[in-house]
Amino acid sequence: MAFAAASALAQTPPDAGRILQETRPTERAPAVIVPPIVAPAPARSAAPAASGDVRVQVSHFEFSGNRALSTETLNAAVAPWAGRALNFGELIQAVEAVEARYKAAGYFLAQGYLPPQKIKDGGIEIGVSEGRLGEVRLEGESRVASSVLFRYLDRLPKGDALTLATVERQVLLINELAGGRASVDLQAGEQPGSTDVVLTQQSEPLVSARLDANNHGSPSTGVNRVGLNLNANSPFNLGERLSANVLFTNTGNLTSYNLRGELPVGGDGWRLSVGASRATYSLGGDFASLEASGTADSLRLGAAYPLIRSRASNLKLQIEADKSKLADHFGASSTHLDKQSQGLTATLSGDWLDEWLGGGSTRIDLALRSGQLDLGPTSATFDAPPAGPDTAGRFSKATLNAQRQQNLGKNLSLQLQLTWQLAGKNLDSSEKLGLGGPATLPGYANGEASGDSGALIKLALRWQARPELTLQRIERGNLLTAGLTPRRPHVE
């Protein structure tokens, strides 16, 4: 059963603000697929010949080569074997317990061994090779300059014990650079106990393209849409990506252009972005008599940093400033409306994988936005209270999008999605929460059933017949939308 305020579902003509929101590109990084980073198998000492069940009385253990973990920590790991008479197999178990303690702390290359013994007072020495970083080498070629790659590789702690989290983070960040892909191989170094990191590169094409076609449009501007996206991958060998996107509808009532550039900065995952867009529209269908048309122009500048980057979990902080200029013209009434908005958005995005109830993935995006809406003379007249919605001036809002993809087995999965927005006042159409669209309510076009504050819960059952094909069924009975009444009722 679906619930929504009747006023939220009333048809209202799209304007430049809604067109801006509808054509705003979704900035989602390409999937990064990197082969697992595997530690070399530990070399075990062979049992002494004809050792039989020879045992040695062990009062305590001594350790050599341990710097990352303290002797007290390692003593706790081998406590079950201290104060006993041990054979060779049991001594190896104590060595493996030391390795397990290192691996639990993230030192995935650490290896324990039994050096030649000089047993004194019942003490057995366990040596530790902590897997310290030796040399870092590049092999192969890519469009990304070696100097850029070494900005990332130089952050590996040379001479110190390597952790899986450190190596994995830098390799994943390198693979986010446009123009190349890379895999890492761990090899024994020249120095005893050291490990060399070899990064093998593979170049990507300079230009890539994608053609999209869908029926996600609005009846008044054209339901069927076609989009073309072009990417220039690292044309200046800096790992940057330049993108151009054009979208238009079958009726010709909507055309959108988007330009975007991303530049990696430093070697720890910082990225700067700049974007510009322009959309033009004219209304047909039920609103053709309005003779309405308009434009929506936008500029964006942003920065992003990965707080956590790994295979299993990620957390990213993004800050973006934007400025938009919106214009609507209604020929039937000779009315021209114009407005400008500017704002700052802070977004925290996280995702993680787990094995709960058969495994699944979770993604959460939380955004806080504050801005200023300035209206032209005619727009200000229509906006003024008590008859108008009073959207001019400062505004703020918080949005949340949470998704859970739960594996049910046999190519079947369940998707649970929560979309929520809370506004501090009545908002312009470019800032409203739209419940319509393919990602939310497929029964409504983009931007329909919109409001200042509201929530949507969606359940979707998915069956993947083949790896390249997913069938999805969304039941209206599984949808719940609840609108929160704003201070001054004004819901589109």
Regions of interest found by a model, annotated:
Residues 6-10:
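Sec/Tat signal peptide C-region and signal peptidase I cleavage site
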Residues 1-5:
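Bacterial N-terminal signal peptides
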Residues 327-489:
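C-terminal outer-membrane beta-barrel translocator/porin domains of Gram-negative envelope proteins
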Residues 11-217, 247-255, 398, 418-420:
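Periplasmic polypeptide-binding modules associated with outer-membrane biogenesis and secretion
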Residues 86, 107-111, 179-181, 239-241, ...:
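Short secondary-structure junction motifs
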Residues 60-62, 125-127, 196-198, 210, ...:
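Beta-strand secondary-structure signal
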Residues 143-147, 163-355:
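Gram-negative/organellar outer-membrane beta-barrel architecture
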Residues 209-211, 230, 242-246, 272-276, ...:
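Membrane-embedded beta-strand positions of outer-membrane beta-barrel proteins
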